[in-house]
Structures are given as structure tokens and as C-alpha cells.
Amino acid sequence: MVAGIICGLAFCVLLYNERITFLSATSLARFSSCARRAAHDAATDGRREKIDGMKEEHKLEYDADICDISEGKWVYNRSVKPLYSDRICPYLDRQVSCVMNGRPDFDYRHWQWQPDECSLPRFDPKRALRKLKGKRLLFVGDSLQRGQWQSFVCLVESIIPNDQKSMKRGRVRSVFRAKEYNATIEFYWAPFLVESNSDLHIIGDPRKRILKVDSIAKHAKHWSDVDFLVFNTYVWWMSGLKINSLWGSFANGEEGYEELDAPVAYRLGLKTWANWVDSTIDSNKTRVFFTTMSPTHMRPIEWNNKDGIKCFNETRPVKKRGHWGSGSDKRIMKVVGDVLGKMKVHVTVLNVTQLSEYRVDAHTKVYTETGGKLLTDEQKADPLHHADCIHWCLPGVPDTWNQIFLAHL
């Protein structure tokens, strides 16, 4: 009976709470599992506490059809150590190696995401490698997706003998190889997924970037024969300016492009990606995942720190349930839900946005590099202009994203 009430309430929430409706293109799938939830309740003699009051030991094992991963809280656990460090894993970019770059506090590495409805299993590197045996895993997207890729590599590499692993880095494509498992964990740089004039040689001024929102073939030819594809695209669209968008010939893109609002251009680009997936991917061979947007934290007033400077000096997650700042654009989330909801090929949504929204403490801040050089002392003393509140320290939040990803595998 409790199961039925919960399922009914969940349906009402889906109808009336916009934030939840567009977080997953497969949200309605959880209602098909109501019978399974009821069966579980019956097996435990109906002794279920309300979700908000459940003790950890009574929680269900993680089941994506039942558990809403976006609802939960961060719990501090000093006894749980990260599976790697930026001093040990040799594959991390200096940009995200916060401790090596002088970050003095370490608590940000000891927060664990605890969903309300279930227990999220810890990342098991042996299980991950068994899942990948004889397969290719490819992360596609921007620097935040590269962070998730590096996190995954570092989470598994420590249990692989040195002579059984290798890394080949490139400007566009990088490949980590686990020889013993005949597996690769790869990254492909495509910040917009669709083609742009800023793909290979990055154009810092967004006013000079031009997107070919109807073209993806140049990138997509590198995504074939892959067993697991994990996509993301968000932050590069959010410059605050209109997007220079082009159809047809790209030869003289400086002439004839149209300036579109970011959500409009994003929808066109994501539809191009979705059409490629639907027309190309064999779902019997390849599983497709989409990581939702990674929040930025630029306005401390949004988490009631009136004297703060961006995310600088933040040392704890936001406690307010449902905190949602301006760094996560709900219009973009709605586009993702709309487009993925109409696709023929099933795409598993890695819904990381809400849980990441709380983590104002976990960005690289001033403990990072820019232009290939570490910030100077003078730059560190000016966090208003130099604190990076977009990227995440590693170990850190992207490790939780990969916990969720592995749970889906």
C-alpha cells in the first residue's frame, strides 16, 4: 500500500514539478517498477518507514527504475578515503590537481552522496574492469567530461600492473588501455558535440565562435564501434551571448550565420546529435549515456553567503534541500528532456546536476592553472577574477558521477 502511495505521489510530482520532469527522459519508467517495489515491501512484511525517515540499513539496493538519484544529501565521512589522489594517479591534468596545486583543505574529498530512497554502492574498480572486459568506453564532450573520464581512469588504474596499462594523449582523442582486460577508456573532445570553428584551435572570445548546428559527421566518425558512449555538452553554450549558428556550407561562416538564443541553438545541436544516435547506433551492441549539466557557482548570494567571493573559501556543501542556482539553466535541462524523450534509441541519463549543485566547496578555485601555467600568488590573491568555479578538483565530485555510471552498468 505504501508503495502505491509513493508511486502516486511521484506521478503528481512529475506533473507539477518542472525540475524533476526534465531531469530524465525515462522518468516514467520508474512507475513500471511500482509492482516490483510493492513486492519488495511485501517480502519485508510491509515494515517500510517513510523515505525521509529511513535508516541507511533499511534502504533498498540501488535500482535505477526505483531510486531517484537526484534526491538525497551529502554526508561527511572522514573514514572513507578516496580510491586515488592527485599525487598518485599519473593521468590527471594539473588543472584539476588541487592538492598538488596547494589547496590547503581536504574535507571536500570526504563527502559521500546519500540518496533518500536507496544505497549507492561504492565504486568497485574490479567490477568496473570486469564490465569493460573486451570493450570500449568513450566519453565525449568538453573539459568537464574530460574530468569525468580522468576520474574513471584514476578509479581503476591503481589495480592494474604497470606493464598492463598505457595512456596515449592527444589534442582531440586520448586512450587509456587496460591490456589485461583488452579494454579501453577513451575521451574525445567535442565541446558542442556538433561541429564548430573552435573545436581544434580554441577561440576564447565566444563572439567569434561559429557553430554548424546541423553537422556532426566530422566528430561522429570517431564514435563508431564503441560499446559504451557517455556524452555531455553544456557550459560552452552558456557564455551569456547569442550563439552564432550556421546551416549548410561552412566555408565562409563569418558571413550568413544567424545569432540564436542559447536554448534555441542548443536544441538544434542536440537534435542533430539525437538524429545521429537514432540513425547509427545499434542498441543491441552499444549503450548510450548522457551526463546532465555540471553546475557553476559564481554568485554566493544564492547560497546565502553575502560576503563570499564566487566559490572561493567555501569549505562545505550547501545544506538547503533543492538548492538550485543560476549556474544551472533549467531551459537547457528542459531541452534535454524534450529531445531525449523523443529518441528511438534508449539513452540512460546520468542525472548529476542536483547533487552537484550543493558542492560549492569542491571546485578548483585558485588551485588550478590557466593557459598551461599555475596561477601566480598575485592571481591567487584576486579570486574575484581568477577563481575557477566551473571545474572540479579530483578526487572529487566527478567520482560520484562515476559511482552512478557504474551502478547503471
Tell where the protein language model's regions lie, with residue ranges:
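A compositional signature for long Ser/Thr(±Pro)-rich, low-complexity
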Residues: M1-L409
